[in-house]
UniProtKB/Swiss-Prot annotation:
Domain of life where this protein originates: Eukaryota
Family: Belongs to the universal ribosomal protein uS2 family.
Name of the featured protein: Small ribosomal subunit protein uS2
Pfam families, sorted: Ribosomal_S2 (PF00318)
Organism (species): Encephalitozoon cuniculi (strain GB-M1)
Gene3D superfamilies membership: Glucose-6-phosphate isomerase like protein, domain 1
Coiled coil: none
Keywords attached to this entry: Cytoplasm, Ribonucleoprotein, Ribosomal protein
Subunit structure: Component of the small ribosomal subunit. Mature ribosomes consist of a small (40S) and a large (60S) subunit. The 40S subunit contains about 33 different proteins and 1 molecule of RNA (18S). The 60S subunit contains about 49 different proteins and 3 molecules of RNA (25S, 5.8S and 5S). Interacts with RPS21.
GO cellular component, one term: cytosolic small ribosomal subunit
Membrane-crossing residue ranges in chain numbering: none
Gene Ontology MF annotations: structural constituent of ribosome
Length: 252
């Protein structure tokens, strides 16, 4: 039987906008260490600091597989998306809003999948996690329940208990935001035919910002607004002086 050498990523070409987003967000920059199971996802190693470079084509291929798995579930609300990291909470919440999944953020209470006595117990069909190390309790319980697990994994993360590993830098707020943003776009593209690269500025909604950074952004915005008002006022005064009617000026 002849082998089909067609790559999964060839079915949906990665848009240039997504390539730029992955690079700008440093999604392709892994750690300095790696394991054997992750070696197939590596593009190379940066000589000056020994940073492992993740192959963007491998990331795209796994994002497509993850999106197909998601679309195979009839009720999206039965898919649990977990992130215990602070900067992973906003991307998870925005992702779930976009695709209809159930977010579980903050501390993952042991027994949330396995103990019916827990105050809020979940019975998901699929699990998605942002980090196999930080979310290891959720992955452990998913193994007890035989839940298919999708995970964003870095170069030194364990792949034990993971069915679909999406190779990506999961220790950067911008990278994890880009990952969930692109995955949500792929899911909606497969389900409804929505454009992949419509309004790329929406990725900002997935990005976590701490209070200090938000204050700086507000101050910068206020300065820009003030400068623009002053410039407009100055131009208006100058234009009025240059084109004013003599009778109007004399009336004062």
């Amino acid at each position: 039987m002849p082998q089909d050498n067609t790559r999964i990523s060839d079915s949906i070409k990665i848009p240039d906008e997504f390539v730029k987003l992955l690079i700008v967000s440093q999604s392709h920059l892994g750690g300095t260490s790696t394991n054997k199971s992750f070696a197939r996802y590596l593009y190379g190693t940066r000589p000056r600091d020994r940073i492992n470079i993740i192959d963007i084509n491998a990331t795209w291929e796994k994002l497509i597989i993850a999106a197909r798995a998601f679309c195979g579930i009839k009720h999206p609300s039965s898919i649990a998306v977990v992130s215990t990291k602070t900067f992973g909470r906003k991307p998870v919440v925005k992702f779930c809003e976009a695709v209809g999944a159930t977010p579980i953020t903050g501390r993952f209470i042991p027994g949330s999948f396995t103990n019916s006595e827990v105050k809020r117990v979940y019975d998901p069909r699929v699990l998605i996690v942002s980090d196999t190390y930080a979310d290891k309790q959720a992955i452990l319980e998913s193994q007890y329940c035989n839940l298919p697990t999708i995970a964003f994994v870095n170069t030194d993360n364990s792949l034990v208990g993971v069915d679909i590993a999406i190779p990506m830098n999961n220790r950067s707020p911008s990278a994890i935001a880009a990952g969930f943003f692109i995955l949500s776009r792929l899911i909606n593209y497969m389900k409804t035919g929505a454009e992949l690269v419509r309004d790329m500025k929406e990725v900002e909604l997935f990005l976590f910002r701490d209070s200090v950074e938000l204050e700086q952004l507000v101050e910068e915005q206020l300065l820009e607004t003030t400068d623009s008002i002053l410039n407009v006022g100055k131009e208006g005064i100058l234009s009025g002086i240059g084109t004013g009617n003599a009778d109007e000026w004399n009336s004062f």
